[in-house]
């Protein structure tokens, strides 16, 4: 028992023994010190054994197949545990159950993602099987627990990692938790693997792993900070703290997870072309202000993002909210301080260009792609495009799920890209995420007559068929030199017209190479912005309106373009123009809310449509020139009968109207709003679609002449192409600044956009 460490007695044969008190005392002292050290060592060993005994008791209880003694069934040698031990054991079980619930949710998401790949018949079978799998009775649960206990002897049951309870945690009842101990012990083998694969998922299942987002996004997020916020813990070793940190995660709630892992997809500018910046310092301006111009038609350069003039200075909160009958559903408040607000003639639109990125670095992204091990294994990776290609995201199929299934899975974009891959040879390999794929939230909703809103299940031919683009490719960048508030393209697609401050520039885009304007049409005053320009159908005349009471009509057929007529109204500014199909009549939306009808042959005012209580912002013609649609800052869209000269319809919204367009061959009206929503209304029935891909004001909107698709642009730098009417996203482009205006050529082969970074961009539409 004792080590052979005692000092030997220095006795030798033949030597007489001499008794000495001092020597005896020294020996006693040495023996005492030796015994004291040995006692201390044995005490430490005893404490260690006691600690191991307590730990074994905990594992013994966790692996016990029977209920707690309080439950009525006693175990032959049930260990007596302190309340603290039961408390910690309950906390560990609680963590384990949350982990298992998370695993179930992710597996359910995988099942829901797989359902669209099946035939309709197999989909029903799978959904029924999923429903049956969720109906587990108590008897089945007890049977499963018994089988697991037989397969796993207690001596080999792996321990469940226990963690010290965090401060303030309310302990769960041990009785109910211990009933699940057998099943939890059997599942404990998954702990290590799950901890490595664990990826935070928000309440809607819309967040993907940060590392993969940085890899798959066209540009890195501006700010992605991940911090750990451990709770107050009682110490029981570094390993337990690490496991607890891994299981509980750095977030206090699912909502916090979403907030901490937002991925901002913005391009990092290479060099600032202009010292002017937006008030907020980061978001590009939305559009030149279109507010009060009653004093003088001053510059558009003072109220960032205010799209229209106001006839009176009122705050956004004071605007009429509209009637409940036709109000848009789910609209959001203004995005930031640069959205339309009260203004005067002196601050009608300071358009500051966000520092522009090189054209070859503009982020062009497919909005509905998904990078994950799931998509990678099925060759469903996101597009990897070159030289400004806009990739078609693929087919997005809505899920028809039972309430049980749909409760655990958000409606999302199905990554069916295999059949519709536009550039398979350019596709980059998907980044393998260490987690479960999560679909983005639904972005298209159908609103019925009774106001019920449901995610839209897209048909299988949503992104295929005649007249549906596959993607778009950037062709030209036209350096206008000022913020481009108006663009139009000729019917021959030879010339593009860009309107900025005080002039319209004409560009020949028929030939490749660098572009310089072939003509400059000086209009209005030099400091006033052009807000709209329209070509007559014959392409021989151009009508220009903006921050002035005068419309200019240019003769483009002359050897040198010249003004051949001017039309003057009482309103201080014009913000939108439309020309009748027969080119005999022109309509102008005025800052005072009136719609002026002009006779182009006699160059005279014919009539005014009065109804908007605030500035009229946008306009379009339908029904072969017999109806006029207008939108305004009074939150209304109005329909006018041009033959009878009266208002036919009025649709009220809870957000200002910035843009609209009528489908050329169907009864659908698309409306772009300050709330960032695009709403597609049926003009003869009380139903509509609400589209939510924009992140800020929707500033312009244009239908293709075939009517099967349309585009919208916004303050969020995005150009979105949508399927009519349900809004399946065809492609998406992210420019370097707010996209203020757009136009589509008559043959639907080209798209032109004007932006806040003082340039216009020409895209080729590829079918």
From Swiss-Prot:
The keyword Nucleotidyltransferase does not apply. GO terms for biological process: negative regulation of canonical Wnt signaling pathway; Wnt signaling pathway. Residues 216-279 are annotated as: CcN domain. Residues 1-152 are annotated as: Q domain. Keywords: Nucleus, Phosphoprotein, Repeat, Repressor, Transcription, Transcription regulation, Ubl conjugation, WD repeat, Wnt signaling pathway. InterPro entries: Groucho/TLE_N, Groucho_enhance, WD40/YVTN_repeat-like_dom_sf, WD40_repeat_CS, WD40_repeat_dom_sf, WD40_rpt. It is found in: Nucleus. Residues 198-212 have a biased composition (Basic and acidic residues). Homooligomer and heterooligomer with other family members. Binds LEF1, TCF7, TCF7L1, TCF7L2, UTY, HES1 and HES5. Residues 153-215 are annotated as: GP domain. Transcriptional corepressor that binds to a number of transcription factors. Inhibits the transcriptional activation mediated by CTNNB1 and TCF family members in Wnt signaling. The effects of full-length TLE family members may be modulated by association with dominant-negative AES. Residues 323-346 have a biased composition (Polar residues). Residues 280-447 are annotated as: SP domain. PROSITE patterns: WD_REPEATS_1, WD_REPEATS_2, WD_REPEATS_REGION. This is Transducin-like enhancer protein 2. The modification Phosphoserine is found at residues 253, 274, 306. The modification Phosphothreonine is found at residue 278. Residues 296-309 have a biased composition (Low complexity). WD repeat Groucho/TLE family members are characterized by 5 regions, a glutamine-rich Q domain, a glycine/proline-rich GP domain, a central CcN domain, containing a nuclear localization signal, and a serine/proline-rich SP domain. The most highly conserved are the N-terminal Q domain and the C-terminal WD-repeat domain. It comes from the Eukaryota. A motif (Nuclear localization signal) lies at residues 238-242. Residues 198-257, 264-283, 296-346 are annotated as: Disordered. WD repeats lie at residues 479-517, 525-564, 569-608, 611-650, 693-732, 734-766. Ubiquitinated by XIAP/BIRC4. Induction: Repressed during TNFSF11/RANKL-induced osteoclast differentiation.
